C-alpha cells in the first residue's frame, strides 16, 4: 500500500518538477495556507474548495505537498424517509428523537431507507502546483488521494482512537462519550448504504485517487491595494472526481478579501474573509453514490494571522481560522425523517451519521507557518467544537517550495 502511495506521489511530482530548478519564494504573500479541508467521509469524494488568502500570484511556480489525518467516528444508524405527505406532516410536529414510524413494506408504508457507519482515521495526500500566468492570474493544479486506516501508533499519534479517548477520559468529555470503546478502538468500519440501493464500503489500508482539481485565480489591481492595503481575488474551479463511487465533474466559484496591517517591531497582522460555492456533480460519468442530495456546497471562512519577522528575513506566523460549510442534505428532510440507532447503549452522538448531514459543519483551525525564501512549512490542527465527529480531531502538515519556470 505504501508503494502505491509513493508511486502516485512520485508520478505527479515528476510531471511537475521536470526541467525545474530550485528558486526563491517571494516571502510573505498574504496568508499562504495549505489545504485545511476536513476529512469528511462524503467530502473526500468531491472537489471541495479551499480559500485563497494570498495578495497576488506567486512570482515563481511553486510545488506543495500536504498531508493530513482526521479521526472520523459515527456509529451505525438507520434512517427512514416516509413518502406519504400526511405522515411527513405528522412527524414534522414531533422532535426528531421522539418520532415513531414502523416500516412494513413499500406498498403499505412507502419510504426511502439508508444506513451508515463511519469509523476510521482518514489520511489525505495532496500534491499541488501553482503557476503564475502573469501578475494578475494564477493556475493551480492539485492531485488528491486518500488512505483509510485504523489509526494506530506511531502514524496517528494525535488522531488515534486511544489518543482521543485518553483526552476524553482525563480532560474533557468523560468516559467513552460517543461509544468508541463500546464498538472497539483501532478498527475500520466504513460502510454507507444509500437510498438508491448503492453501497459504499472501504476497508483498512484502502487507497484511492480522489481526483484532479484545476483552480484559476484573478487578482484585480485596485487603488485599495496601495491606499488601504486591501487585496481581493476571485476564483473559478473545476474538479474531476475519479473514485469509483463518484466519477463526476464539479465546478465552483470563490471570492476572497485580505486586509494587511503593518505593526511595530517587525510584526504584521492580516485579516481575511472568503466565500466559496461548489456545484457538485454537474456531470456524472456513471451512476454515483448519493453523497448528499443538496447539489450545492457553500462555505464561509475567516482568519486572523499575526506574523513576526526575524532578523534574517524569515517569519513565524500564527493564524486562527473559522470555517463553516452548508449541509450535505436538503434541510426539509430533517423535519420528518425517522432515525434508529443504539441510543441506550451510547452516551451521545448515536444519531450523527444521518443527523449531521442536515446541519452546517463548522470547525476552528490553529495554523502555524515558518517561512523562508526557500520553503514554507505549515502545521495545523482542526477541532470540531460541535462534536459532529466528521472528523472529531484533525492534524496536518504542508511543505511548499519554489520551482523556476
Regions found by a protein language model. Give the residues of each.
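Transmembrane beta-strands of outer-membrane beta-barrel proteins
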Residues: 59-67, 137-141, 228-236, 251, ...
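Residues that define the transmembrane beta-barrel architecture of outer-membrane proteins
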Residues: 45, 59-61, 119-125, 147, ...
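A subset of solvent-exposed loop/turn segments in beta-rich extracellular surface proteins, enriched
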Residues: 21-198, 326-350
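Outer membrane beta-barrel transmembrane domains
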Residues: 170-194, 284-405
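Residues on the lipid-exposed face of transmembrane beta-strands in outer-membrane beta-barrel proteins
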Residues: 49-51, 125-131, 212-220, 238, ...
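Transmembrane beta-strands of outer-membrane beta-barrel pores
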Residues: 67-73, 143-149, 218-220, 236-242, ...
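Short loop/turn motifs that connect adjacent beta-strands in outer-membrane beta-barrel proteins
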Residues: 21-25, 47-61, 130-138, 221-230, ...
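Outer-membrane pore/translocation modules
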Residues: 139-295, 302, 333-353
Amino acid at each position: 500500500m505504501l508503494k502505491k502511495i509513493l508511486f502516485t506521489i512520485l508520478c505527479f511530482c515528476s510531471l511537475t518538477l521536470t526541467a525545474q530548478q530550485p528558486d526563491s519564494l517571494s516571502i510573505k504573500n498574504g496568508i499562504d495556507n495549505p489545504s485545511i479541508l476536513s476529512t469528511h467521509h462524503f467530502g473526500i469524494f468531491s472537489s471541495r474548495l479551499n480559500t485563497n488568502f494570498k495578495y497576488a500570484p506567486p512570482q515563481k511556480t511553486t510545488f506543495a505537498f500536504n498531508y493530513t489525518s482526521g479521526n472520523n467516528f459515527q456509529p451505525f444508524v438507520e434512517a427512514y424517509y416516509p413518502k406519504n405527505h400526511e405522515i411527513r406532516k405528522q412527524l414534522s410536529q414531533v422532535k426528531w428523537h421522539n418520532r415513531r414510524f414502523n416500516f412494513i413494506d413499500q406498498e403499505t408504508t412507502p419510504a426511502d431507507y439508508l444506513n451508515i457507519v463511519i469509523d476510521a482515521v482518514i489520511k489525505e495526500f495532496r500534491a499541488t502546483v501553482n503557476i503564475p500566468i502573469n501578475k494578475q492570474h494564477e493556475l493551480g493544479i492539485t492531485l488528491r488521494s486518500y488512505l483509510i486506516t485504523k489509526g494506530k501508533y506511531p502514524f496517528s499519534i494525535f488522531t488515534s482512537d486511544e489518543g482521543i479517548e485518553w483526552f476524553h477520559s482525563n480532560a474533557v468529555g468523560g468516559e467513552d462519550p460517543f461509544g468508541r470503546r463500546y464498538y472497539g478502538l483501532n478498527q475500520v468500519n466504513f460502510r454507507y448504504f444509500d437510498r438508491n440501493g448503492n453501497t459504499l464500503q472501504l476497508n483498512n489500508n484502502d487507497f484511492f485517487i480522489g481526483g484532479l482539481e484545476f483552480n484559476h485565480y484573478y487578482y484585480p489591481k485596485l487603488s485599495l491595494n496601495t491606499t488601504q492595503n486591501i487585496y481581493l481575488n476571485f476564483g473559478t474551479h473545476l474538479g474531476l472526481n475519479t473514485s469509483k463511487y463518484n466519477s463526476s465533474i464539479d465546478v465552483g466559484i470563490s471570492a476572497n478579501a485580505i486586509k494587511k496591517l503593518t505593526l511595530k517591531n517587525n510584526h504584521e497582522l492580516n485579516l481575511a474573509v472568503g466565500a466559496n460555492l461548489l456545484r457538485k456533480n454537474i456531470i456524472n460519468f456513471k451512476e454515483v453514490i448519493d453523497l448528499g442530495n443538496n447539489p450545492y456546497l457553500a462555505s464561509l471562512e475567516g482568519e486572523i494571522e499575526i506574523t513576526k519577522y526575524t532578523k534574517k528575513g524569515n517569519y513565524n506566523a500564527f493564524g486562527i481560522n473559522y470555517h463553516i460549510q452548508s449541509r450535505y442534505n436538503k434541510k426539509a428532510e430533517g423535519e420528518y425523517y425517522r432515525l434508529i440507532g443504539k441510543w441506550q447503549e451510547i452516551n451521545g452522538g448515536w444519531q450523527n451519521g444521518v443527523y449531521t448531514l442536515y446541519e452546517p459543519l463548522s470547525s476552528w483551525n490553529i495554523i502555524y507557518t515558518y517561512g523562508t525564501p526557500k520553503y514554507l512549512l505549515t502545521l495545523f490542527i482542526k477541532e470540531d467544537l460541535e462534536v459532529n465527529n466528521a472528523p472529531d480531531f484533525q492534524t496536518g502538515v504542508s511543505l511548499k517550495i519554489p520551482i523556476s519556470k
